[in-house]
Each structure stands twice: as structure tokens, then as C-alpha cells.
Amino acid sequence: SDKPFATLVKVQEVVVAGDVVYINPGTYVVPANQVPMTTTNSGLYHCVFHMNKSGEAGKPISYLANPNKQGRPIFDLSQVKPKDQRITVFYVTGSNLYLKGFDVIGTQVTITGHTQSECFRIVKGANNNKFEDLRTHDGMAIGFYLLGGSNNHILNCDAYNNYDSVSEGGKGGNVDGFGGHINSSSVGEGKGTGNVFEGCRAWYNSDDGFDLINCFEAG
């Protein structure tokens, strides 16, 4: 289109099952004053983008780097520093979504006590999603934090150069590349199976590359 949408916030107002959203290459600096699409946990989590729309089986909603243009889209979160809140860049509650080919950089931490931020937070009810060739790097946040949902496929994604210099004296103890934390309390009613990390790489993260400490089952 000669009049593309400027933000994912606007995109989320209009997408429906079967739509393909092409993201042009370039760096998208999220402004400090952008209102979060939602907050969770009594306001503790500042969720920049809420991926709450769902596709259907065989008709996913796709968010893809534009294959007709050279270069990667980069979402730069370095200006987003909400006081006393944890930052989640992509809060995923929808199902049958396909995200591919972009970067998330510069995600911040503002709380000086025990805390964490996340680039992707996937929760119960988010099922049958595919995350491919996504890079989360050069920030203070966990790359992927999987808390719930079933049959989510995280494929060939990278998390690197992430270190939290702000909380707990800058020890960086909560910044994992990938976290799979589906436990018995978050599963409920037999949900929470079939999630796969495949071909993912993690390096130079200040805590674990892959953390399954709270996962009820891993194979």
C-alpha cells in the first residue's frame, strides 16, 4: 500500500484471520510516551504490544518482515522506561499467529529490586502460534518467556547480548535467553503441551541461555 500503517497498535485494530501484515525494514523507535496496549498483574506489567487477535486453523494472522525489501525490521525499545513497571514488548494471548523475521532490541528494566522484563511473553490461551527467525538482543530483557499455551513453535530464534544492569545491583541474574515455565498450576485442564523450541540460539545473556526450572515436563 502507498499508505501503510505507522504502528502495530493500529494494525491490531483491524487485522482478522487470514491477514498478512508485512513489516518494512528499518528501525522503529517506540516513543517513551506511547501508551501500552494493555497492563497486567494489577499494573505491574507494561505491555507495549498486545497480540490479542487470533487467526484460525489454516488461516493464521501473519506478521512478517517484508520479503520484497532488503533488511530487517527492528523494534527499538530503549526509550520505553515506565517507572516501577516490568516491560513486556510482545504480550501474546492470541492463537494461530505467525511472527517472522524481525528484531527486538533495547528493552529496558526500571525496577531496582527483584524483577524482569521480557521481549515475548506467551501465556495460557495462546495456542498454535509460530515464532520464526526473531532476534532479541542488546537489551535488559528475557528473549522468550513461555508461561502457558499449547503447540507453540519457537523456530530458529536468537537471544543474545542481554544484561540487566539496573535491578538487584546489576547482577543480571534474571535475564535468560529462553524460558519455558509451564507448570502444573498454569497448565490446567490438560493444556500447555506440545510447545517446542527448535534451532534456537542463545549467547551472552547474563543468566541462563535456556531456563526450564519451573517447567513441569521437558523432553
For every predicted segment, state its role.
Residues 3, 82, 126:
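Short, glycine/acidic-rich beta->alpha junctions
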Residues 37-51, 79-90, 112-123, 138-146, ...:
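Extracellular beta-strand/beta-solenoid scaffold signature
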Residues 25-27, 33, 146-149, 212-214:
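Short, well-ordered beta-to-alpha junction loops that form the rim of enzyme active sites
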Residues 20, 142-143, 151:
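Beta-sheet entry/capping signal
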Residues 1-10, 14-17, 25-31, 67:
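Right-handed parallel beta-helix/beta-solenoid
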Residues 16-20, 59-60:
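Loop/turn elements at helix/coil->beta-strand transitions in domains of secreted/extracellular proteins
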Residues 24, 60, 64, 69, ...:
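Right-handed parallel beta-helix
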Residues 25, 29-42, 47-115, 163:
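Right-handed parallel beta-helix/beta-spiral solenoid domain characteristic of secreted/periplasmic
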